[in-house]
């Protein structure tokens, strides 16, 4: 059996070990907008080449594009993006930004053509975009308040004038915001990220910002070609009572008119990780052969193996159960399904674990240096010999070796048995 590292080819930066800290995989929306983000995130073509179009991302983007195209069915004027820490919310916001700032040309990018067919629209609508990133926003001349900044992004000085002179101290009402949208001269998309971080840093503006968001959601509802996407954290990691109070207030205001979206479907994490870490996962023939061999071996020994290895529905027929297990091994390749299961079952319970981003960072070392962690005959990246990441420069998550004895014994037997 071919070992995985002779079949799959990691990306160049992974082979060189350049990406290790979770921050290496983090997207900063404000940098994308300012055109000073790393090239993989800054350039739309490269960004979409590395984007996994998960079901969640296709649904989110499709709803927004339909709304901006003037469609009202199967969409909403305000969307809340619910996500685990490091779970893909900024990737979704960045995808939306690149789509609507590129417009019709975006159909040339990987996956966008299929997205348009699924959404039932002919082309990507070009829109004026205002992005508010709370952990990067501070007042300065020309953007004394968040609403002045947003008005300027949408319609320049004309947009700011529509707010009136009181905007320097008072949040605008729905009519003023409607005038700003009109001044933009076309579809408008509003992207909000890290709102709670902004409130925490500018507590004196909390009540004003709360009123602004309330009026903004109402004004957006009154448009036919406008949408607002607001990211809200699912977890309450390191939140103070004040943080939780304001998160609850903002959430209640937004959800009066918003549709909730979940940023990353956990069942598709494997494809996200594969797309980001590997430039090629080898021939279909080899992958299918390895998956079939492993799945057959595990199915015959399913009573002795940990349940997360097989996840077989006892109510299914034997043929369906075998096929499900085979497809699971094939979809996860070159990662053993149990490897990804460790992240989803156990690590997510850790308060500082960053879901997709943490999985990516942890997968770099064994992917870049397979001979260090794997035996020559191993067909998959398996959990028992997986050297997990340890990043501690800022006192962040520090994890050593994970060595699950039942999994290790099963893997050892699997190697000799297959």
Language-model-detected regions and their locations in the chain:
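Conserved P-loop NTPase catalytic core
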Residues: 118, 125-140, 144, 218-222, ...
């Amino acid at each position: 059996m071919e070992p995985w590292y002779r079949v799959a080819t990691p990306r160049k930066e992974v082979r060189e070990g350049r990406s290790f800290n979770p921050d290496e995989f983090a997207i900063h929306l404000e940098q994308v907008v300012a055109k000073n983000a790393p090239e993989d995130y800054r350039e739309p073509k490269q960004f979409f080449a590395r984007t996994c179009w998960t079901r969640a991302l296709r649904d989110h983007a499709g709803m927004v594009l339909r709304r901006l195209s003037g469609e009202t069915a199967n969409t909403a004027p305000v969307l809340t993006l619910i996500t685990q820490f490091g779970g893909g919310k900024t990737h979704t916001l960045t995808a939306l930004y690149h789509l609507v700032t590129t417009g019709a040309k975006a159909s040339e990018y990987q996956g966008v053509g299929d997205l348009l067919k699924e959404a039932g629209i002919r082309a990507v609508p070009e829109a004026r975009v205002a992005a508010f990133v709370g952990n990067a926003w501070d007042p300065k001349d020309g953007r004394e308040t968040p609403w002045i900044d947003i008005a300027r992004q949408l319609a320049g000085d004309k947009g700011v004038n529509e707010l009136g002179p009181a905007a320097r101290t008072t949040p605008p009402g729905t009519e003023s915001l409607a005038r700003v949208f009109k001044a933009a001269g076309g579809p408008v998309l509003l992207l909000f990220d890290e709102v709670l971080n902004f409130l925490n840093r500018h507590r004196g503006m909390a009540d004003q910002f709360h009123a602004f968001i309330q009026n903004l959601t109402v004004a957006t509802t009154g448009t036919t070609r406008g949408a607002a996407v607001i990211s809200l954290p699912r977890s309450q990691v390191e939140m103070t009572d004040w943080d939780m109070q304001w998160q609850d207030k903002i959430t209640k205001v937004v959800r009066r008119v918003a549709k909730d979206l979940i940023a990353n479907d956990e069942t598709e994490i494997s494809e996200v990780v594969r797309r980001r870490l590997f430039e090629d996962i080898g021939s279909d023939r080899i992958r299918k052969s390895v998956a079939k061999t492993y799945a057959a071996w595990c199915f015959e020994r399913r009573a002795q193996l940990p349940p997360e290895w097989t996840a077989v529905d006892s109510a299914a027929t034997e043929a369906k159960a075998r096929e499900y297990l085979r497809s699971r091994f094939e979809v996860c390749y070159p990662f053993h399904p149990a490897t990804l299961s460790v992240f989803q079952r156990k690590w997510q319970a850790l308060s500082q674990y960053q879901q997709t981003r943490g999985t990516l960072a942890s997968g770099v070392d064994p992917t870049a240096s397979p001979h260090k962690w794997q035996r020559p005959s191993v067909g998959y990246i398996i959990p028992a010999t997986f050297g997990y990441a340890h990043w501690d420069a800022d006192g962040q998550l520090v994890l050593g070796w994970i060595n699950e004895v039942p999994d290790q014994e099963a893997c050892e037997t699997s190697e000799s048995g297959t």
